[in-house]
Each structure stands twice: as structure tokens, then as C-alpha cells.
Amino acid sequence: MATAVLFIGWNRPYPGREGDAFRFLLSEGTEMLEKFKADGFYESREHVGLTAHGGDLNGFMLLFGERAKLDELRRTDAFEKFVMRLGTLMNGLGVI
């Protein structure tokens, strides 16, 4: 049973990168996330898109799992690759 959460949030895609951003989230990024899950780093995830509200947080995902495994995931090269790629596509990216 999950006792912790890893938050990955963003503002919006960089102008002109909208298609690339959503393709990444729906294909390569999803494949990477599924591999992290298969490797036991987290138990489940949720994706959330927010309606327009004038703020700078417009979408996020939550990875649910055990704190030690989520901490371990954050230190893997594969997760760093995922975050760095997402950071080239999404403005205001943050991982907490």
C-alpha cells in the first residue's frame, strides 16, 4: 500500500512544442513510466490537467508508492532522462 507520493508538475508546453509535449506524455513518456512501475519504483499513478485559472500550475502527475522506492527512482539515470526530456517540452516543470 502506497504511503508516499512523487509530484511532477508543469505550467504548459513551450510555444510551438505543444504537439511534441503531448506526444511524449502519451507515448515515450508513458513507456518510461510503465517501466519504472514494472521495476517496482511505484505502485500507481494519476495524471491531472487543470482548467484555465490564471495560475502557473496547469498539469501534473502523481506517482504513488513507498518513500524509499520513490527516492530511489529519483536518483536513477532513467528518471533523470525522463525529467530532462519533459523539461525541454514543459515550462515551469517541478518535481517534489
Please state what every model-predicted region is.
Residues 1-57, 65-75, 95-96:
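Short S/T/G/P-rich N-terminal loop/turn motif that feeds into the first structured element of a domain
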Residues 81-96:
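Conserved short beta-strand edge segments in small beta-sheet-based binding/regulatory domains
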